[in-house]
């Protein structure tokens, strides 16, 4: 008689995905972020569900309902801060996961990579709408500024913005629909993540060397279940330390003031994980141009498989590409810093140079570096 996990229709799926899955024997801790993202999604859905039980999506009572959660609900403050900082953890894991994919050439699994980009867009949309819900000053003005960017679209822009707002400004209709979308999108993300895994298991995992590993595979369980579990414990320990000791470090103080349409904050800025894209948006002194650059800053990831010129998949043995990769990482840190600064010299020019460098490295320098490295290998 066959083992139940190999014969039962449901267990068989789990078995093929998490137990008997043949996995390269040399994947490093950089491959832990997929499971960590799954953990983040579970944390966010669970904490969000409990918050939704006490939250009111009405302009009059949204802000006070969040205060009520923090003051009167048992451990409401903890659930709220887990959810707020869980978003930051989610994006840290996301960016590290994408960085791993770029460094080790995982983008050559085109279907998996493209579904990953869709997941990134869905997560960014969810996070943006969630940021609006507490109805603080930065929530309101962030929603106003970011949604208003769509008015730059020729001909239909203004109508589109008013359609999204459900009126002539960000108001009750906007808040209600944002709450509805913020609630449903994580489940769509979970379903899309399943498709992401489906495509990944068609090809099998990449590995640090970037070479086929069919000759040296080991079962996922117990080796990588244990490794993932260790990663989860370490990240959860750091995360809970952060939540319990520095819960407001990444938040904006303006969000402790209720939304006031008559009083604009001096510096409107999104959460830290969007600042790099916000800096790219602001570096172009034209509304439509800025919006196009903003979208392209994420969409440019889809070009990685097309721009891969090197004979080797991974950057592990490509020093020129390595240098450019870490320059790109540094550039993203600079863009994140600039996104949080006011629009005045010298920040304007720094942001413009950093934006040009960002696109130059991805679209021009990395493909050229790949060709140069091919030439060096032939010598």
From Swiss-Prot:
SUPFAM superfamilies (alphabetical): a domain/subunit of cytochrome bc1 complex (Ubiquinol-cytochrome c reductase) (SSF81648), Transmembrane di-heme cytochromes (SSF81342)
Binding site for heme b b566: 97, 196
Gene Ontology CC terms: mitochondrial inner membrane; respiratory chain complex III
Gene Ontology biological process terms, A to Z: mitochondrial electron transport, ubiquinol to cytochrome c
Membrane topology: Multi-pass membrane protein
Subcellular location: Mitochondrion inner membrane
Role, per record: Component of the ubiquinol-cytochrome c reductase complex (complex III or cytochrome b-c1 complex) that is part of the mitochondrial respiratory chain. The b-c1 complex mediates electron transfer from ubiquinol to cytochrome c. Contributes to the generation of a proton gradient across the mitochondrial membrane that is then used for ATP synthesis.
Description of how the protein assembles with itself and partners: The cytochrome bc1 complex contains 11 subunits: 3 respiratory subunits (MT-CYB, CYC1 and UQCRFS1), 2 core proteins (UQCRC1 and UQCRC2) and 6 low-molecular weight proteins (UQCRH/QCR6, UQCRB/QCR7, UQCRQ/QCR8, UQCR10/QCR9, UQCR11/QCR10 and a cleavage product of UQCRFS1). This cytochrome bc1 complex then forms a dimer.
Family recorded in the similarity comment: Belongs to the cytochrome b family.
Descriptive protein name: Cytochrome b
Lineage: Eukaryota, Metazoa, Chordata, Craniata, Vertebrata
Gene field: MT-CYB
